[in-house]
């Protein structure tokens, strides 16, 4: 029977585990996450509100720091510098995209790596490549690993086609899955790959994150692969705008073993991994490594 993944139920199960973990170790309301919001896009505001709600539900303190369209880059850098030095701040994230006149690399890399719980700084990306467990893996990549593990989808010796090469998603996933202990043979494709269908037909697992609606249909797949669809786009229909993934979901759902939908798929698990990383940051920065071991056993990745 083909499986359509339910990310909401998956994440809710672990939210209860994290909530109880914080209660048991007297950590409720003692871990602080700062969220920088510097754009006016409705989607970004929605994502921030979800992160804020979930964090508060499990027992984290959250502050959303908003910047107007008139803000300049130095305004954000000043706030990040302040929070880097603030001993009560455990994690700092910047909701992307930023305002057009701002350089995201400069801003992301201004966050001290020990508080970069989105795992997007050069330091944390380097730690990920080297397998340093004190670093932070980007949350979406971590969500993919968590889904594969919990759903019993073996990667060792399997062919994984990753469609997308962004530093936020595609590159981290391809690096991680080709490393120990995942040991997959990874083929990286992207929106300009000429023979995408040829590579996809070799795949045991397909992970797509390019943001091109309905790029992948059943004619491009072979042998009922597992599919994790991270891409999200808006498309026009006769009934107005709807969300679409990189896959033509209705077209392929019956010819794959497993698939994540656009709504309630990878998104809730990505938020879960942000909560995990934030708690991890607090434990590392306070030398609470015995408690960190317990956390990592509860939320195995």
UniProtKB/Swiss-Prot annotation:
The lineage of its organism: Bacteria, Pseudomonadati, Spirochaetota, Spirochaetia, Spirochaetales. Coiled coil: none annotated. Pathway: One-carbon metabolism; tetrahydrofolate interconversion. This is Bifunctional protein FolD. Gene3D superfamilies: Leucine Dehydrogenase, chain A, domain 1, NAD(P)-binding Rossmann-like Domain. Pfam families: THF_DHG_CYH, THF_DHG_CYH_C. Homodimer. It catalyses: (6R)-5,10-methylene-5,6,7,8-tetrahydrofolate + NADP(+) = (6R)-5,10-methenyltetrahydrofolate + NADPH; (6R)-5,10-methenyltetrahydrofolate + H2O = (6R)-10-formyltetrahydrofolate + H(+). One of its GO terms (cellular component) is cytosol. The gene is folD. It comes from Borrelia garinii subsp. bavariensis (strain ATCC BAA-2496 / DSM 23469 / PBi). Its EC number is 1.5.1.5, 3.5.4.9. It comes from the Bacteria. Catalyzes the oxidation of 5,10-methylenetetrahydrofolate to 5,10-methenyltetrahydrofolate and then the hydrolysis of 5,10-methenyltetrahydrofolate to 10-formyltetrahydrofolate.
């Amino acid at each position: 029977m083909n499986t359509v993944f339910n990310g909401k139920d998956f994440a809710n199960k672990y939210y209860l585990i994290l909530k109880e973990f914080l209660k048991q170790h007297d950590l409720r309301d003692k871990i602080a996450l700062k969220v920088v919001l510097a754009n006016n896009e409705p989607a970004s505001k929605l994502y921030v509100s979800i992160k804020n709600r979930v964090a508060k539900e499990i027992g984290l303190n959250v502050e959303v720091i908003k910047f107007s369209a008139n803000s300049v880059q130095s305004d954000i850098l000043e706030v990040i510098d302040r929070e880097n030095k603030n001993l009560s701040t455990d994690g700092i994230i910047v909701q992307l995209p930023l305002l057009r006149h701002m350089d995201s690399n400069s801003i992301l890399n201004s966050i001290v790596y020990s508080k970069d719980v989105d795992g997007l700084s050069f330091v944390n990306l380097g730690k990920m490549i080297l397998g340093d467990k004190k670093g932070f893996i980007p949350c979406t990549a971590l969500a993919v690993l968590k889904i594969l593990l919990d759903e019993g989808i073996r990667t060792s010796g399997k062919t994984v086609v990753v469609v997308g090469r962004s530093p936020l998603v595609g590159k981290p996933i391809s690096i991680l899955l080709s490393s120990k202990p995942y040991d997959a043979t990874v083929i990286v494709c992207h929106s300009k790959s000429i023979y995408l269908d040829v590579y996809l037909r070799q795949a045991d697992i397909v992970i797509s994150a390019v943001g091109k609606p309905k790029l992948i249909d059943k004619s491009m797949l072979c042998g009922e692969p597992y599919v994790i669809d991270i891409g999200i786009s808006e498309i026009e229909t006769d009934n107005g705008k709807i969300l679409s993934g990189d896959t033509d979901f209705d077209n392929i759902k019956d010819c794959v073993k497993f698939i994540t939908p656009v709504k309630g798929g990878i998104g809730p698990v990505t938020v879960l991994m942000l909560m995990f990383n934030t708690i991890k940051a607090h434990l590392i920065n306070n030398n609470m490594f015995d408690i960190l071991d317990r956390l990592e056993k509860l939320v195995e990745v």
